[in-house]
């Protein structure tokens, strides 16, 4: 998913689903700034402590439901979602910057595919359905 996202040093990245923080650390190395959301309090706290201890200082942690993104910090050059909604959330597309890219698993529990959503410089949205996957639901 990270490779599909094509993150560069100038990018501001929204990550939904911090998890253990592994993906967050990779995004932190590749980008200028990461805004990450984790809905599970214990997981969020552990990830925050771990990544701060390791010196990842360009990450803003939020223990909250990130399924609607974070309008206050938008627009984002890249958005990575690590849980699967039934359909692509319009709220996230609206927060994608021109020339931005979002990688997100989409579908029901047993019928999910990675989707690569790009927005061109004019704001036109393009959606490409990719690899079959299985992620936890984005609730």
Regions found by a protein language model. Give the residues of each.
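SAM-dependent Rossmann-like transferase core, predominantly class I methyltransferases
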Residues: 2-4
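C-terminal substrate-binding/catalytic core of Rossmann-like NAD(P)-dependent dehydrogenases/reductases
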Residues: 137-139
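Conserved nucleotide-cofactor-binding alpha/beta core module
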Residues: 6-122, 126
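Conserved histidine-centered catalytic loops in small-molecule metabolism enzymes
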Residues: 126-135
């Amino acid at each position: 998913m990270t490779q599909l996202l094509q993150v560069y040093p100038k990018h501001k990245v929204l990550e939904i689903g911090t998890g253990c923080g592994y993906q967050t650390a990779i995004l932190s190395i590749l980008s200028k700034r990461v805004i990450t959301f984790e809905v599970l309090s214990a997981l969020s706290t552990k990830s925050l402590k771990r990544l701060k201890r390791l010196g990842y200082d360009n990450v803003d942690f939020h223990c909250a439901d990130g399924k609607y993104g974070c309008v206050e910090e938008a627009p984002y050059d890249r958005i990575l979602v690590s849980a699967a909604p039934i359909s692509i959330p319009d709220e996230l597309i609206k927060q994608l910057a021109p020339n931005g890219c979002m990688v997100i698993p989409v579908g029901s529990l047993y019928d999910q595919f990675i989707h690569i959503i790009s927005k061109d410089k004019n704001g036109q949205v393009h959606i490409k359905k990719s690899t079959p996957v299985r992620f936890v639901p984005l609730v």
